[in-house]
């Protein structure tokens, strides 16, 4: 009975390792795909890291695991370097100018998107993300301004004003 329990525990441990490895692979693949999609076509670093993802490598977890537990996984050969978080000043100015001109309706049309991609040198997902983030920033600025106005009104009240 103990022997059977030990075998079950060993196999359970191996299955847990396999599941963890698959989750890690899926997360890595998802991140690589997101990075690759947001890269410009001429960005060699992103392309080379995606090519490296197809390289197979065998993993063995423990010597107690049965043969079927040896799993192959793909590992990138190159690390994706973190890119600069700020856009060039000219691109920021173009995007900011577009936003102020379209403040009443700050949503991109296909034509606007193409023009901004051409003017800024950024790719379409970067432009869409910037505009989305800018709308969010505008909402929070508006809300915080309204809150501060309300707080200022409350502090101006005197005890005689309260009924």
UniProtKB/Swiss-Prot annotation:
Its main location: nucleus. GO terms for cellular component: nucleus. Residues 80-142 bind DNA. Disulfide bonds: none annotated. It holds the Pfam family Homeobox_KN. GO terms for molecular function: DNA binding; DNA-binding transcription factor activity, RNA polymerase II-specific. It is found in: Nucleus. InterPro entries: HD (IPR001356), Homeobox_CS (IPR017970), Homeodomain-like_sf (IPR009057), KN_HD (IPR008422). The keyword Secreted does not apply. SUPFAM superfamilies: Homeodomain-like (SSF46689). Keywords: DNA-binding, Homeobox, Nucleus. Mating type proteins are sequence specific DNA-binding proteins that act as master switches in yeast differentiation by controlling gene expression in a cell type-specific fashion. Belongs to the TALE/M-ATYP homeobox family. In P.angusta, all mating-type proteins (MATA1, MATALPHA1 and MATALPHA2) are encoded on one idiomorph, consistent with the fact that P.angusta is a homothallic haploid in which any strain can mate with any other strain. This is Mating-type protein ALPHA2. The gene is MATALPHA2.
